[in-house]
Structure formats: structure tokens, C-alpha cells
């Protein structure tokens, strides 16, 4: 096997050795993907009280992926993220802050929001989701919001026989969930804030027993702690979560979040210089119409 902590590519790759030469096809390899239904899942159902955007397969691969939003990320973006929040490193204090996305289109157009899976370094199989709210984020308000699962399984390492159901760059379009917990479709009105949660190592563990949920809204966390860091690579915003073990590297699971139109989501965060990359990928890094990345540090 070849192992890498490089985010955005498969973390564990099978190899062969012939005449002292190592051979490997560096491709995403998913585990079994038998379809399952929302009502009769044979492996993992969303915990009671959580909403879902559709059905998924037994490896946690959503049946509602948005292929139009799928993207191969440039080396420029991936190298920059890796250098800022490396595996086993220490995320700079200046970037540690709380950032939930707020929809605010200056022209008051219809806004759609999507999330793209980037990858991660975790050996945990965690579910990732979101919630919508308006105004001040009180603990009671966030507790009352309807939580929706986007990706039931964010595991990418094929470690400890855990399933792999996602490839880097795959995408889901979100739905606006109003204050009554009702799905209002894909158009988000101005003034709505979107928070995020990571249900740590929950996939295939029968609901929420023995797992910890980490939130991007500090008041929603039991200790009130800010677990997020944020920085900007040109117009590309990275958000990260620190886990319960507080190992400070903030890189376990990462996501790209953007809006259409792109002006509708524009958080104010510190800027870092992009990695130079190569001539053949710079145009990709700057022309794509995405607005941000979420990176979660889990509780593994």
C-alpha cells in the first residue's frame, strides 16, 4: 500500500511490486455500493430528528450527487491548503475564528448554495451536515434548528475495513430549511445563515450513541469553544474544524462551499498567498465559480 496525508487524493492505494518496481494506479476506489432506501436501510440510518436530502448506498455514497457541480481541484488550491493546515501541524492562531456562511446577495437574486467534498486525513467515518438560521446564534436557537445530513460518510482512507463512498470533488446542492424545519427547495433568501456540523465517526454506528457532534457555531458546542479556523486563497475561502482531542491541525475533513451567484456568500477572513502550482493548473484555480472550503478536524 501507499499512504498519503495529501488532501484531495485517495489516502490509501494498493500497489504491486515487480522486479523491484512499485506499480500503482492512483485512482479513487470506492467500496461496495448496493443501493438502499431511506426507510429500509441495511447499514446506517440518519439519527432520529435529523433530515436527509435523499437516499444513499450502503457505503454512504449519496444518490443525490450533483454531477454538474463536480470538479477536479487544481494543485494550486490543494498544495496551499496542505501547507497551511498540514497533517500533524499546528494551524496558525490568526486563522482560528468562527465563520458560518450568510446569504447576502446585493442584487437580491435567487441564490443556490452547494457543497463539494474535498477529502481529509481522518480514519473516522463521520457524517457531515448543515442547518439554517437567522439573526443571532443563541444556543437555544441552534439547538432547535433542523439538522440535515449532506454526506453520511466522509471516510476516504479505507482504514480498519471502513467503507469509502465519496471521491474528492463530488458535490451536493443544498436546500433551504426554514425556521419551522420545512424544506423550501434550493433557493436561499437573503439573511439566512448556514452552519455546519460533523457527526464524529457515526457511520454504521446505529445513530448517535457514543458519538460527538461538533458545530461551526461555538454556542452550539457543549463547552462553547470555537472549533473553526478560516483563511482565504485569493477568492477561495477555507474553513476548518478542530476536534475534541484538540490536536491543532484542523484538517480531518474538508469541503468547498459556494453560491450561485457567487457574490451571495463572501465571508471576511484572513488571506494567504497561493502556492505557485504549475502553469497548467493556475487557470483552473482562479476561474472556477466557487466561494469556500470547509475543513473539519474530527474526534478520532
PLM segments and residue spans:
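Extracellular distal adhesion/interaction modules in secreted or cell-surface proteins
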Residues: 1-300
Amino acid at each position: 500500500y501507499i499512504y498519503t496525508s495529501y488532501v484531495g487524493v485517495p489516502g490509501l492505494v494498493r500497489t504491486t511490486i515487480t522486479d523491484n518496481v512499485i506499480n500503482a494506479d492512483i485512482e479513487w476506489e470506492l467500496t461496495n455500493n448496493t443501493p438502499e432506501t431511506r426507510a429500509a436501510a441495511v447499514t446506517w440510518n440518519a439519527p432520529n430528528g435529523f433530515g436527509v436530502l435523499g437516499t444513499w448506498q450502503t457505503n454512504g455514497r449519496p444518490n443525490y450527487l450533483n454531477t454538474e457541480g463536480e470538479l477536479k481541484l487544481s494543485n494550486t488550491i490543494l498544495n496551499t491548503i496542505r501547507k497551511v493546515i498540514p497533517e500533524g501541524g499546528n494551524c496558525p492562531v490568526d486563522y482560528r475564528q468562527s465563520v458560518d456562511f450568510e446569504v447576502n446577495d446585493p442584487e437580491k437574486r435567487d441564490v443556490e448554495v452547494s457543497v463539494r467534498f474535498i477529502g481529509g486525513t481522518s480514519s473516522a467515518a463521520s457524517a457531515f451536515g448543515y442547518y439554517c438560521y437567522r439573526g443571532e446564534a443563541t444556543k437555544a436557537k441552534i439547538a432547535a434548528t433542523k439538522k440535515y445530513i449532506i454526506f453520511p460518510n466522509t471516510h476516504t482512507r479505507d482504514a480498519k475495513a471502513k467503507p469509502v463512498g465519496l471521491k474528492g470533488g463530488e458535490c451536493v446542492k443544498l436546500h433551504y430549511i426554514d425556521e419551522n424545519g420545512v424544506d423550501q427547495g434550493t433557493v436561499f433568501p437573503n439573511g439566512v445563515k448556514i452552519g455546519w456540523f460533523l457527526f464524529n465517526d457515526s457511520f454504521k454506528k446505529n445513530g448517535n450513541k457514543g458519538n460527538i457532534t461538533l458545530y461551526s457555531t461555538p454556542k452550539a458546542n457543549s463547552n462553547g469553544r470555537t472549533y473553526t479556523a478560516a483563511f482565504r486563497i485569493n477568492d477561495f475561502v477555507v474553513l476548518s474544524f478542530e476536534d475534541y482531542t484538540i490536536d491543532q491541525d484542523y484538517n480531518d475533513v474538508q469541503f468547498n462551499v459556494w453560491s450561485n451567484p457567487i457574490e451571495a456568500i463572501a465571508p471576511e477572513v484572513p488571506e494567504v498567498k497561493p502556492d505557485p502550482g504549475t502553469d497548467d493548473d493556475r487557470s483552473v484555480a482562479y476561474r472556477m465559480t466557487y466561494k469556500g472550503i470547509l475543513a473539519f478536524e474530527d474526534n478520532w
